[in-house]
Amino acid sequence: MSIRKRMNVLFGTLLLTGSLFSQNVCVSTPETSLVLSAPVGGELKHVYYGDKLSEVDLQNINLTGTPDMPAYPVYGLNCPGESALAVKHADGNMTLQMEIVQVKTSKKENAEITAIELKDKVYPFYVNVYYLSLIHI
């Protein structure tokens, strides 16, 4: 097999593998879309916010690059900007490193509720992040 064919196979495998482990969550209204990267065991990251995306756009959003902006920044590791949450644990440590436990979506009347459960990797500290979107106005 030529080097070019091997590179194509490797690139295709990496794309497939990357999309298998990523879990995007889309919170949409009739006019807008918010896309979050929410892999279980990973960090909640902001992917896109803007005009409503089509199904094709949503399927291809992973091709736009790797999300690197935390959707819920916490005080401690890797948060040079403003934090959404800071705590002081019983031992005095203020570091948080939140990972996703689960993502649930439910519908209630004319709204869709997305609940993302986060937990600290070291301490028994949990946070639920909720997104509410109106389906029909």
Predicted feature residues:
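Bacterial N-terminal signal peptides that target proteins for export
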Residues: 1-11
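Bacterial N-terminal signal peptides
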Residues: 11-19
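Residues that act as N-cap/strand-start positions at coil-to-secondary-structure junctions
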Residues: 21, 30, 123-125
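Acidic-aromatic substrate-binding/catalytic surfaces of carbohydrate-active enzymes
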Residues: 24-117
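Short, low-complexity Ser/Thr-rich regulatory SLiMs
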Residues: 38, 131-133
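Low-complexity, acidic Ser/Thr/Pro/Gly-rich terminal tails and inter-domain linkers that flank the onset
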Residues: 121-131
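Conserved small/polar residues in nucleotide/adenosyl-binding loops
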Residues: 135-137
